[in-house]
Amino acid sequence: MLRFFILFSLFLHSSVAAPKTPAAAAAVPAKKWLTLNGQEPAVVARGGFSGLFPESSISANDLAIGTSSPGFTMLCNLQMTKDGVGLCLSDIRLDNATTISSVFPKAQKTYKVNGQDLKGWFVIDYDADTIFNKVTLVQNIFSRPSIFDGQMSVSAVEDVLGTKPPKFWLSVQYDAFYMEHKLSPAEYLRSLRFRGINVISSPEIGFLKSIGMDAGRAKTKLIFEFKDPEAVEPTTNKKYSEIQQNLAAIKAFASGVLVPKDYIWPIDSAKYLKPATTFVADAHKAGLEVYASGFANDLRTSFNYSYDPSAEYLQFVDNGQFSVDGVITDFPPTASQSITCFSHQNGNLPKAGHALVITHNGASGDYPGCTDLAYQKAIDDGADIIDCSVQMSKDGIAFCHDAADLSASTTARTTFMSRATSVPEIQPTNGIFSFDLTWAEIQSVKPQIENPFTATGFQRNPANKNAGKFTTLADFLELGKAKAVTGVLINIQNAAYLASKKGLGVVDVVKSALTNSTLDKQSTQKVLIQSDDSSVLSSFEAVPPYTRVLSIDKEIGDAPKTSIEEIKKHADAVNLLRTSLITVSQSFATGKTNVVEEMHKANISVYVSVLRNEYIAIAFDYFSDPTIELATFIAGRGVDGVITEFPATATRYLRSPCSDLNKDQPYAILPADAGALLTVADKEAQLPAIPPNPPLDAKDVIDPPLPPVAKLASNGTEGGPPQTPPRSGTVAIAANLSLSLLAMMALGLLYTA
């Protein structure tokens, strides 16, 4: 246990945001809030940091205190043992959150609770000594880490109060049930004299009325909790929807209400937001505060939020029309940063850091990649660099698309499946390739959002699945100039194959397009030329303003001097995989490499790719929050740019004052310390050691010279020189694809279990 506390304190000290002194807070300009009292909305941590550790465990409570904004509130769901001891657990049944069913496998019972028969292991059947000494906690949401299961004891209410959170909220869900079994939550509270309890909530009107005078003397706020609109409130036997019609009556026994978040922003069957209800306005008019519950980073919620949990909080606290007075969350640091750092953020604020926000096929998390809509949204979202991976049609038109194979990212399968072919130089599976179709044929199909997580059931913005138009390279460059973006990135793929086998000179086409756009004759906008082929980059050496970026598409663990010297001959920057900077195993960050430092010593910039918002793509160490991942790579690893499919998330972070760790402020978004979270788990639960990534071999940087563009017959199927030798960037394609498939299968098992 001592080891646990030492390691955990180190984890807190090194990797999470600790609130600073109130004096620093005074320097921050006051924000105008649309809450009932005009104050900042409260962050209420349900069971501490229950999104990571078992609910109300000492770890969950300590981490919530260490990562939340000053003045946050700790929420404990009160349950009572048969000898009257108060515990902090969300359910009256113990089997979903503890090991009780394995300790007493034959002790399942059935009780009637609020008119319904429930089966399980009920807390009222066990005394406190049994629960504290024989039962341990488990994570009750299966997509969350199970590595801490069975290691932490159930917390008594007094244990949580002993952590001295800034504020404490006690939720009493089952007063009527406990009273039936001769246990009184009201008497339990009186025994505590309400000390340290700032807020008490309950869905039972009778209970709130019974403690009203005591709570008033203790200056404890009472909150009435609404359940499902069709559920029945035990005291009045009225549906909650009926009680909602007379909010003014609630003011007689409570100062606020707690509602599921869809009472405020309902979501339709397609998972898009419906117009906001008038609930907050009506409650505020009645003099009631409004708290919204149900927030978590690892829930699939409205597509309007683009899998960015901060966007959801902002919808409730900074929509220009109203603000809730507080949010109940399993991930308090995300709520804290959303309210403290991102609310009332002027869209024109300058970035706090030097890192570039570079798109991956535009805003391809929201629209089909490389379409006009994806690029426009990326520009609107504040991206610095928009990107175009250049593909070629059979008749020589250069256009922007993620890959030469159109199968996954267009509707080509419905029309051109008979044109599918095998091109082992590009990929190990058959595909419908752009260079086998004319531009007119390509334009006859629709773009399609490419979803890297289809196997796990995740979707991306299905309402716009096929929206937008394909973008030619010329149109892309004109868009970049017209919108005055910081720069453009041109990614050149398969140049050797296209030249030798298809008679298409993609390098020459790109050079010509840049010349025609005059981007080769100015220094106002950046031009980045990216390729996994060093010979392609060398062909642009004669244009000094261009930044040449070598894409290294395999995991590396080190960058030896010989490899770096070879990179310097061809490139000014590298594009590296996330796992080349921070190693990950089973969704835990296990360590970090020195690759960024090694590249920077040689004056080589480092861009990291690809960042996505979906929580299944984000290590637990980042709190299932894309913002923490951004902070880890930008502030923690010092990268020079992030390549992302959701540029709005990256831009919001970089424009927030909380991203500047040199400022003295009340809250900062700090990077995670890779590997620290795993040390909290017991030794027996540790992950098996994984071998380090191999170092970058200089041979993998060197490519043969580009072959000349072959003169082929007009049908594009004859002629051409012999097969070219394999390029460095394609050496590991087959292996990487196999690993990707295995990883996808593993994710599917992990997140559908």
UniProtKB/Swiss-Prot annotation:
Subcellular location, principal = membrane
Q: Which parts of the sequence are annotated with region: Disordered? A: 707-729
UniProt key word Flavoprotein: no
What keywords is this UniProt entry annotated with?
Glycerol metabolism, Glycoprotein, Hydrolase, Membrane, Signal, Transmembrane, Transmembrane helix
Its EC top class is: hydrolase
Q: Where in the cell is it found?
A: Membrane
Provide the Gene Ontology terms for cellular component: membrane
Q: What is its EC number?
A: 3.1.4.46
- Per its record, how is this protein called by name? Glycerophosphodiester phosphodiesterase GDPDL6
